[in-house]
């Protein structure tokens, strides 16, 4: 029986460094098989529930296509498609769905919700995103980094993340760096740093794995020598508009632009973004942002960087599929 069978995937620190590498190796194998047309279906007859309290493009498509590729069937429960937490408790929902499904994905708000689902469902539960963590995204990121620097192991790579580091991406990056021994720099104003106690705990683990975690407000110091630059949106659609101006003013200096790429001193530096990105005014929100906040060239990243040869964001997006498939196969298949 494989080491992942019937386990949950709630956050990265639930796994050992070796287990994270094993999942990445499985994703690489599954991706190769899909590309060559020789993929073997290991989830035939399995039924999967996808609970989305927050809408999504990449996460939903990745789970659905991964399931179909492997012969499984899915039921999508959107923001208005279930009674979870409204007419029915999370605990009761978990016990009902666990009788009908072989695996459950949750994308929503508090981490406690997905943990409660896992506690009572009796089947593997996977975290597609919560306010605190985004572990499936980090698996895709690590796979993408390995692919683009094949001659470097993860524990020899340097990644600088610019922007608001207090969110689920900042937390999951900390966990990932600590586990694989990466050199991680969180480059942000102090007001946007993660919780200190959590940072300290990840730094302690990083010391054991050979990693290094640095927090700095200094952009030049933070990005110097980086192999990868990473950013995410500065504001979320669910946040009140009143906080947008303050956040944007705070983070404007941390925009990823060509000047920042030059500061790395690495002409081969690559750019990562978990998407969607506000890099132009070709969307309703993007146009509104550009006009209202004087951001004609993009918000967290400029159009110039996003469309450049440095950008590997669509390789990164594709790898959501292969890494999510690896998680499902590993936790629902005995072999």
From Swiss-Prot:
Q: Name one GO cellular component term.
A: cytoplasm
Quote the pathway field: Amino-acid biosynthesis; L-arginine biosynthesis; L-arginine from L-ornithine and carbamoyl phosphate: step 1/3
Compartments, record wording: Cytoplasm
Residue sites binding L-ornithine per the record: 168, 232, 236-237
Major localisation: cytoplasm
Residues where carbamoyl phosphate binds:
56-59, 83, 107, 134-137, 274-275, 320
Entry EC no(s):
2.1.3.3
Question: Can you supply a Gene Ontology BP term from the record?
Answer: citrulline biosynthetic process
| Reactions it catalyzes | carbamoyl phosphate + L-ornithine = L-citrulline + phosphate + H(+)
Q: Which UniProt keywords apply?
A: Amino-acid biosynthesis, Arginine biosynthesis, Cytoplasm, Transferase
Family membership noted in the UniProt record:
Belongs to the aspartate/ornithine carbamoyltransferase superfamily. OTCase family.
The protein's role, per its UniProt record:
Reversibly catalyzes the transfer of the carbamoyl group from carbamoyl phosphate (CP) to the N(epsilon) atom of ornithine (ORN) to produce L-citrulline.
The record ties this protein, via NCBIfam families, to: orni_carb_tr (TIGR00658), PRK00779.1 (NF001986), PRK04284.1 (NF003286), PRK12562.1 (NF009213)
The name under which this protein is listed is Ornithine carbamoyltransferase
Question: Which source organism?
Answer: Yersinia pestis
Gene this chain is encoded by: argI
């Amino acid at each position: 029986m494989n080491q992942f069978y019937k386990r949950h995937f709630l956050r990265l620190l639930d796994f050992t460094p070796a287990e994270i590498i094993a999942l990445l190796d499985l994703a690489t194998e599954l991706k190769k098989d899909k590309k060559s047309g020789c993929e073997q279906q290991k989830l035939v007859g399995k039924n999967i529930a996808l609970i989305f309290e927050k809408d999504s493009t990449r996460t939903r498509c990745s789970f659905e296509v991964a399931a179909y590729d492997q012969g499984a069937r899915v039921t999508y429960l959107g923001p208005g498609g279930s009674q979870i937490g409204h007419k029915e408790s999370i605990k009761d929902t978990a016990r009902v769905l666990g009788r009908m499904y072989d695996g459950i994905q949750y994308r929503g708000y508090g981490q406690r919700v997905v943990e409660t689902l896992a506690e009572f469902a009796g089947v593997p539960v996977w975290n597609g995103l919560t306010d605190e963590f985004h572990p499936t995204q980090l698996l895709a990121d690590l796979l993408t980094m390995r692919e683009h620097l094949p001659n470097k192991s993860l524990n020899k790579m340097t990644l600088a993340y610019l922007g608001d580091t207090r969110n689920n991406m900042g937390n999951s990056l900390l966990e990932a760096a600590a586990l694989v021994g990466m050199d991680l720099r969180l480059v942000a104003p102090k007001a946007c740093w993660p919780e200190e106690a959590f940072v300290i705990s990840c730094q302690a683990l990083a010391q054991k794995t050979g990693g290094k975690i640095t927090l700095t407000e200094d952009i030049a110091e933070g990005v110097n020598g980086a192999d990868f630059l990473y950013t995410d949106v500065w504001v979320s659609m669910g946040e009140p508009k009143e906080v947008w101006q303050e956040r944007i003013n705070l983070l404007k200096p941390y925009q990823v632009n060509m000047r920042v790429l030059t500061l790395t001193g690495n002409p081969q530096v690559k750019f990562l973004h978990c998407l969607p990105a506000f890099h132009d005014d070709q969307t309703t929100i993007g146009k509104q942002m550009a006009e209202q906040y004087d951001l004609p060239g993009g918000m967290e990243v400029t159009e110039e960087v996003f469309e450049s040869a440095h950008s590997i964001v669509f390789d990164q997006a594709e790898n959501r599929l292969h890494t999510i498939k690896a998680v499902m196969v590993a936790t629902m298949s005995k072999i």
